[in-house]
Each structure stands twice: as structure tokens, then as C-alpha cells.
């Protein structure tokens, strides 16, 4: 009985940051909400205009897919950085020295704004890996496809495996990196979700190291289902590359758990999965 009460109290403590964030939104007032909506409108207009222009360039470059990848990265650097600047979000980046070499970059996914961080911070020569439905995301989904990034059909295992094999072939031949969200979807409350196995399969086939990107605070800056962007301090932390040269197929589940545990240790309590705050930070 005592153990049950302790667990209940721990879960309540973990929910406090989310409750506090909701209370803060209520206190923001009409002006701040309208200002946030205005910023979102401005960013949407910028993305709309530039996406159309950049999309035309991509169409002209259809015969040169790898040039499209690099130009797509350049577009992401410019637009991603501009959007974050307009929102006025204070950012701290740690460990950027770990982005100098080819790798599989992975990031937790807790907010709509994460996509702009990934666009902004992905090194030139990085291929994105996402679910096939990304093509239906307005503007960015179409640019993603035109930029020759990879879409995975998760409902069809055979097709997904073939897509990953093609991804490995491309990045090996052209000396490219990969970037993806291993959770496979966006968290509703900012807490880390279980990881899919795709990034481990890619590591096994490519032998590229894995570089974890730890995004902290994005779930408070822009929460799923809202139009309120708040200037909450955000930290982007790159961890040292994790070598995969000696990884073997029979330990896939172990590798997924190991990398997931790396995130649990490095995320704040408000972003850890429920019941995991007893692990070291």
C-alpha cells in the first residue's frame, strides 16, 4: 500500500510542469495570444512564399537528386533559423562539435516547432527519414519530397525495409548523413515515447555512428493542438557519437533500449516517461 502511494505521488509530481504550463497560458492575456497568432501567420506566409519559389527550383533540378538534398538543407538552415528568430525563442546549443562528421542524427519529438529546429540544425548533406504521410503536411511535406528525402511506409514492412536499404545505398555512395525522430510521432505532453527500431536497422546497415540530439523545452514553447508560441528557453544538446561498428542483428532490442535510456538520463523530469524519474539525470 505504501509503495502504491509513493508511485502515485511521484506521478503527480511529474505532471506538475504540464499543469504549470497550462496555467501560464491562461495568464498570458489576449494581447500575447494575438501576438503569437500574428507571428505564426507571418511565419506561415514566409514559408508559403519561399516554399513555392524553392519548389520551382527543385523541379528544375529533378535530374540532380543529390544537389536537391544539399539545397534542401540550405533552405532548412535559412527558414528554420528565421522562424525560430521570429518566435523570439531563447536557445542554448551544446555539443555542436559532434556534428562535424557523418552520422545518424536522432532527436526526440515533443512539439510542432521541433521540425524547424531539425531543419535549422541538420548539417549540409543530411537526408531526412520520415513516415510516408509527411507528404501531406502543407508546403513542408511537398518540399521534403522534392528535396529527395526518404519516406517510410510503416504499414508495409517489406516496403519499409526496401526504403531503408535504398537510404543506406544513397548515403554510402554520396557520403551523406541521416536525421530522424526515433519515436516515429510527436509526443502529446512532451514526455519521451518508446522508440521504433528503424534507426537501429539503418545503423546496422550503414555502420554510421548515432548522434543523439536532446531537445529540452520545446513542448512548453509550442504544445500540440495550440496556436500559442511562448518564448520558453530551449536547449539543444548533441551527445558524443555512439559507435555502431560492432553492433549485431541479434541485439536490436538491446540497442533500442540503450539509446532510449540515454534520452531518459538526459531529459528533465517533465519530459521523462512516467515512472522513470528515479533514473539519474
Curated annotation (Swiss-Prot):
A motif (HXXXXD motif) lies at residues 109-114. The keyword S-adenosyl-L-methionine does not apply. The chain crosses the membrane at residues 40-60, 71-91, 110-130. Converts lysophosphatidic acid (LPA) into phosphatidic acid by incorporating acyl moiety at the 2 position. This enzyme uses erucoyl-CoA as an acyl donor. The HXXXXD motif is essential for acyltransferase activity and may constitute the binding site for the phosphate moiety of the glycerol-3-phosphate. It catalyses: a 1-acyl-sn-glycero-3-phosphate + an acyl-CoA = a 1,2-diacyl-sn-glycero-3-phosphate + CoA. It is found in: Membrane. It is an enzyme of class 2 (transferase). The gene is PLSC. Keywords: Acyltransferase, Lipid biosynthesis, Lipid metabolism, Membrane, Phospholipid biosynthesis, Phospholipid metabolism, Transferase, Transmembrane, Transmembrane helix. GO terms for cellular component: endoplasmic reticulum; membrane. This is 1-acyl-sn-glycerol-3-phosphate acyltransferase. It comes from Limnanthes douglasii (Douglas' meadowfoam).
Amino acid at each position: 500500500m505504501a509503495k502504491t502511494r509513493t508511485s502515485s505521488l511521484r506521478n503527480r509530481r511529474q505532471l506538475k510542469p504540464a499543469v504549470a504550463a497550462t496555467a501560464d497560458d491562461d495568464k498570458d492575456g489576449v494581447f500575447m495570444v494575438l501576438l503569437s497568432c500574428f507571428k505564426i501567420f507571418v511565419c506561415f506566409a514566409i514559408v508559403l512564399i519561399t516554399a513555392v519559389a524553392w519548389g520551382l527550383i527543385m523541379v528544375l533540378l529533378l535530374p540532380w537528386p543529390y544537389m536537391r538534398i544539399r539545397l534542401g538543407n540550405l533552405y532548412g538552415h535559412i527558414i528554420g533559423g528565421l522562424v525560430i528568430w521570429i518566435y523570439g525563442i531563447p536557445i542554448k546549443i551544446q555539443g555542436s562539435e559532434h556534428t562535424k562528421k557523418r552520422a545518424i542524427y536522432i532527436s526526440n519529438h515533443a512539439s510542432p516547432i521541433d521540425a524547424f529546429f531539425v531543419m535549422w540544425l541538420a548539417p549540409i548533406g543530411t537526408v531526412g527519414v520520415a513516415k510516408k504521410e509527411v507528404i501531406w503536411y502543407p508546403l513542408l511535406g511537398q518540399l521534403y519530397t522534392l528535396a529527395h528525402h526518404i519516406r517510410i511506409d510503416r504499414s508495409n514492412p517489406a516496403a519499409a525495409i526496401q526504403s531503408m536499404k535504398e537510404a543506406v545505398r544513397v548515403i554510402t555512395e554520396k557520403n551523406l548523413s541521416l536525421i530522424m525522430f526515433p519515436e516515429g510521432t510527436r509526443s502529446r505532453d512532451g514526455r519521451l515515447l518508446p522508440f521504433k527500431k528503424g534507426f537501429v536497422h539503418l545503423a546496422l546497415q550503414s555502420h554510421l555512428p548515432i548522434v543523439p540530439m536532446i531537445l529540452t523545452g520545446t513542448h512548453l514553447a509550442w504544445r500540440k493542438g495550440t496556436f500559442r508560441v511562448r518564448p520558453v528557453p530551449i536547449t539543444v544538446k548533441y551527445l558524443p557519437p555512439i559507435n555502431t561498428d560492432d553492433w549485431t542483428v541479434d541485439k536490436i532490442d538491446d540497442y533500442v533500449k540503450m539509446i532510449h535510456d540515454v534520452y531518459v538520463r538526459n531529459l528533465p523530469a517533465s519530459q521523462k516517461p512516467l515512472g522513470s524519474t528515479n533514473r539519474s539525470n
